[in-house]
Structure formats: C-alpha cells, structure tokens
Design a protein with these regions (language model features):
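Extreme N-terminal, non-catalytic leader segments
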Residues: 1-9
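ATP-binding Walker
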Residues: 19
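P-loop (Walker A) phosphate-binding loop of NTP-binding proteins
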Residues: 16, 28
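Hydrophobic anchor at the beta1->P-loop junction of P-loop NTPases
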Residues: 11-13
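Walker A/P-loop
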Residues: 22
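ATP-dependent NMP and nucleoside kinases share a basic, alpha-helical "lid"
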Residues: 99-107, 112-145
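ATP-dependent small-molecule kinase phosphotransfer cores
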Residues: 40-109
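Small-molecule kinase domains that catalyze NTP-dependent phosphoryl transfer to phosphate-bearing small molecules
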Residues: 100-101, 109, 127-128, 139, ...
C-alpha cells in the first residue's frame, strides 16, 4: 500500500476532569506524537468563533455574556446544574470539534496520533478511534487538582464529575 493512503493509528486519550490527561498528553508530545486537544478546540470556538458564540447566545440568552465575551463561570454553572443545557452545548460544540479533528487528522504524517478528550464517549467519537487510553486518578486527587488549577469550589468540581461518564462505563465498552 502506498504511504500516501496509510492512516495513522488513532488513539483516544480520555478520563474525567483532573485525572491527568494533559500530563499524559505532554509525554506523548515529548515523543513527537501529535496531540489534538478537544477541550482546547472547544474553548477556542467559544472565544473566537463568532458563529459558535451566536449559537450559544441563542441557546442560553444574552445574560451569558460579559463584556462581549462568554462568561465562562456563569456558563459552567448553568450547564453543570441542568442536564438539558449540558446536552444543548454539547450538541453545538461536538460536531464542530469533530470537523476540526477530521481536518487536523488529514494533515498528520505520523504513525500515531492522540485525540485527547474528556468526552470521547459522550461525543460519540470513540468508535472512530483505533485504541482508547483511560487516565484515572482517585476522586479526591482529581478534586484537589481542579480546585488548584481552575480556582473552583469543591461543590463545582463534584458537579462536573457527576455529569461525566463514569470510568466503569468506559471500561465496560
């Protein structure tokens, strides 16, 4: 088979918030393996993509804005206390991130690539990958990491964790 038509091995890297996905990604990057960070691309869409921002305003209202930008603490509070709102934002973002990943993948020339995403299964993209790596950490450790990293309260972090797929469900897939 010609080198041009060979697809890289697509590896999904997942785990709950604060599990250590970014640390593992850095190891892969240090080995020269390209990493697509889904969370970074989602945030970029919410900060820079006017079309996405308009969709968010339409779904969540003008009150979600602060100084012409999305008020992320307010958005987080809304989506992690209302499962319907969480589904709404995922319905907006997941297809856009999937398209960005597809475009990025076409440009890769390595034998392996990593797609880092806390929501591989929720976004229905896990089945498009060849292998999955699940990064795990004790819940208490995860909570402490996120409190320090994101300046969130324990209650906020627990709400996020409770809205993510359980590790047991990933292992049983």
């Amino acid at each position: 088979m010609s080198e041009i038509f060979k697809q890289p091995l697509k590896i999904g890297l997942t785990g709950g918030i604060g599990a250590g996905k970014t640390t593992v990604s850095k190891i892969f990057k240090s080995l020269g393996i390209p990493v697509f960070n889904s969370d970074d691309h989602s945030k970029n869409l919410l900060v820079k993509n006017k079309g996405t921002i308009k969709e968010i305003i339409k779904e969540f209202g003008e009150a979600i804005m602060k100084d012409e930008s999305i008020n992320f603490p307010k958005l987080s509070q809304i989506i992690f206390t209302d499962k319907k709102k969480l589904k709404s934002i995922n319905k907006i973002l997941h297809p856009k991130v999937a398209l960005l990943f597809s475009e990025w993948l076409k440009k890769q020339k390595c034998k392996y690539i990593i797609k880092e995403s806390a929501l591989l299964f929720e976004s229905n993209t896990a089945s498009l990958l060849d292998k999955i790596i699940l990064v795990q950490a004790v819940k208490k450790t995860r909570i402490q990491r996120v409190i320090q990293r994101d300046n969130r309260t324990q209650k906020e972090v627990e709400r996020i964790i409770n809205n993510q797929i359980k590790e047991k469900e990933i292992i049983n897939c």
